[in-house]
Amino acid sequence: MERETQTYFFPDDGRIPNHPDFPLVVYQNALKDTGLAERIVTRHGWSNSWSGSVFPYHHYHSNTHEVLIALRREAVIQFGGEKGAAIPFKSGDAVVIPAGVGHKKLSSSPDFTVLGAYPGGVQYDMKTGKPNEREEAVKQIKQAALPANDPITGKREPLLEIWVK
């Protein structure tokens, strides 16, 4: 199957700020061999990787963007907060989540596993939409560094062509 990309833009919902300029980018069928996922994203400048699942509550990172790649099985992930989109996510799919965009696992197969990584290996923060974290988080979202490359292709496109500032 051929790789396809879809974009989703989420406005601030009052709790989850989302990103004011950049949409979520979903890559269906991003990788044929998920065993190479960590090596690929690292080669493309995305590191500080981990593998596991996605938290079952809304959260976001204000200081960095994030790539998630489904390594095993499938899940439904909600992006953008309570009023966001529930997106099916299966082995081989990837998503680049802009700083500030909320994400939460709604359901999954028991052994669903993702790889997460960050441009330049940034140490990510964890925000859950509490009122006392909002003001600083909104500032940090706007300051999150643009990645040098798309984590899947290693080129500007498609990510950086979509994220035109």
Swiss-Prot record:
Coiled-coil ranges from the UniProt annotation: none
Leader sequence residues: none
Highest taxon, organism lineage: Bacteria
Entry-linked InterPro entries: Cupin_1, RmlC-like_jellyroll, RmlC_Cupin_sf, UCP019307_cupin, YjiB-like
Chain ranges of the Cupin type-1 domain: 28-139
Protein name: Uncharacterized protein YjlB
Organism ancestry: Bacteria, Bacillati, Bacillota, Bacilli, Bacillales
